[in-house]
Amino acid sequence: MATPISEGAEGYLERFSVGNYRHLLTGIPGYPQIENAALAVLACDALGVSEEAIRKGLAAAKNPARFEILREHPTVIYDGGHNENGIRSLVTSLSRYFPGEKKSVIFACMADKEIDVSLSLLAEGTDAFFFTEVKDNPRALSAEDLAAKAETLGIRGTVCKTVGEAYEAALAADRLTVICGSLYLYRDLTDYLNKTKTK
């Protein structure tokens, strides 16, 4: 596969070139999306898809819960990264778009996930961890067990039984907040945000 060449960021989207295509723009935020978009472009090119359609397709591409900006001032990002590779991608994007900025992390995960490396990667530049849990999922690791696991790695945080509680606590700190560790948590968070909008 031809290697994509980064041409810089536009907000949280990335400009890139690949093959015979120049100045393409990803539709999904996050630096690692360049590789995904480049693969899609080359596949479309091989199938004879027009350049105009390729550009429109990239612009229209959306993937909720993947470096999704939920709000600004302070910025809140949801990323469904739930394994080492996903968390590495998240950390890469954070260092690109928010260099040196301190953050709060809201984290939940499934009990069968290996999280030592993920938590260690997230710990750098994190001022506060909020450990929560996914509702109504028998595979979910409890917030208390998650906090205990993190403590064995030298990472301390606040235990929050719901993502709503964690969200409000993190928001009170008025800094970049990242929510990650499980795609299942996205449903709980959007349910909470939708309920608070209607109050």
Locate predicted features.
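A glycine-rich beta-strand to alpha-helix segment
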Residues: 165-194
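ER/Golgi luminal nucleotide-sugar-dependent glycosyltransferases, focusing on the catalytic module
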Residues: 144, 190-199
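Nucleotide phosphate-binding/pyrophosphate-handling subdomain across enzymes
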Residues: 20-128
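C-terminal helical cap/extension that packs against the catalytic core
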Residues: 10-15, 75-76, 119-176
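Extended acidic/charged loop-beta regions that coordinate divalent cations
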Residues: 1-23
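Cofactor-binding loop segments of dinucleotide-utilizing enzymes, especially the Rossmann-like FAD-
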Residues: 107-111, 133-134, 181
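Active-site catalytic pocket residues across diverse enzymes, especially alpha/beta-hydrolases
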Residues: 47, 94, 150, 193-197
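Short glycine-/acidic-enriched loop or helix-start segments at secondary-structure transitions
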Residues: 87-88, 115-117, 140-141, 188-191
